[in-house]
């Protein structure tokens, strides 16, 4: 039903002109917006709901200031419509759409709505309003979570089709998750939240096929294929596709580490690094190998381990062509070509190309090795054979004894 038309301006009972008011006085008729029947028919359901809420809120503000006056016919109409638009009510236009539309048509309609500039007024509902068995949740009750049935039936590529948009929700209309109890203002937000419980990823990238549980995550991912990097670091000039990635990168320059471990106090610059570090204390190994069943705490460790089964060596040396399973192994190998030795011994200062060689070399500095360290009369006086009570030398001692010699 269309709202009432704009009332005629009140007239002075003693004269022929309009009623006199104090300068600066404002009435509801001065700020209200009225639509004729034809204009009202052009509005979408969400726009109509927004109009009703704004008019009711405006009249409430004027009444609080004591200038509301008698209740206008428009407000009486809004209150009558509010009863019809309860949480269980359905838009008449939505009721006409009982069959699922083609996903391509839905995407075209969505683009058309964005061109009309109504994106800020509407919130898409990823579940078709006419889907059988779909009801708006009223109060928590036993049974499967809201939207669970529809999620299993949703198409695997693209966003589930839309028939029409629901009205803009009010503050008292909250949609609760029956799994964890969280509540949301938008029903579509609740449905996307339920995907986190089911593990379903219905939003697929048309370029690479990767799936996402949220439409916003897919939108951010698409920027990678478009090559967009709008967020640039002012320190080094490096650009990123997402603002959050730039924020994390800036901590490299500032040295900020806001995430601290409650068990050992170690601090990290990213929350994901802290989350993975916590597995060191909990002993959690959630990433098992599908071939041998061995579990790992980090997905990167699992990927490296899987290469021992497949024999894959994806990191070739550009100098000699030798391939390695890990990039760190290839980087250490390249030092044999460049002669770089970045790891010094803290006791004698001798430098090595690999950190493991430093650890093996430090065995000669062990306490109680016997003999006077240093060169005497042109020869090495340190005893290279283990003494009584010494720990066994590392394996590399027999293979590479030259790395255990001390510098004079």
Curated annotation (Swiss-Prot):
GO terms for molecular function: DNA-binding transcription factor activity, RNA polymerase II-specific; RNA polymerase II transcription regulatory region sequence-specific DNA binding; transcription coregulator activity; zinc ion binding. Residues 26-97 form the KRAB domain. This is Zinc finger protein 764. Its main location: nucleus. Gene3D superfamilies: 6.10.140.140, Classic Zinc Finger. It comes from Homo sapiens. The gene is ZNF764. The keyword Signal does not apply. The keyword Ion transport does not apply.
